[in-house]
Amino acid sequence: MTRIKRGYIARKRRTKIRLFTSSFRGAHSRLTRTISQQKIKALVSAHRDRNRKKREFRGLWISRINAGIGDNDKKKNIYYSYSNFMYNLYKKQLLLNRKIVAQIAIFKGNCLFMIANEIIT
């Protein structure tokens, strides 16, 4: 059988992986086996954190809404929670998502106060 020389192909594959990990520190950007392991680890983390980011932002929006509603409660001397607020929003068929309501709570607190007054009555 004839000999097949494929050193170029392997070098090309390793170079492609090395370009991906070129910004990593130390041996993670130099040693071939470590490079391939770190590439897999980086891609797994990126995939996991794409979903985690959505979860964390939703939690952030909820805490901002709850804080905004809490500020309004101090003005009116009544207790009004996030869950009651969202329930009343959907009951009145006001289709505002949590991101928009959180932005209203931060930048226009009085608008959130007006919305809360409208849906509570």
From Swiss-Prot:
- Domain of life where this protein originates: Eukaryota
Gene3D superfamilies per the record? 6.10.160.10, Ribosomal protein L20
Coiled-coil portions? none
Kindly list the GO CC terms recorded for this protein: chloroplast; ribonucleoprotein complex; ribosome
Q: Where in the cell is it found?
A: Plastid, Chloroplast
What are this entry's molecular-function GO terms?
rRNA binding; structural constituent of ribosome
What PROSITE patterns does the entry give? RIBOSOMAL_L20 (PS00937)
Q: Name one GO biological process term.
A: ribosomal large subunit assembly
Q: What exactly does this protein do?
A: Binds directly to 23S ribosomal RNA and is necessary for the in vitro assembly process of the 50S ribosomal subunit. It is not involved in the protein synthesizing functions of that subunit.
User: Which family does the record assign?
Assistant: Belongs to the bacterial ribosomal protein bL20 family.
Q: What is this protein called?
A: Large ribosomal subunit protein bL20c
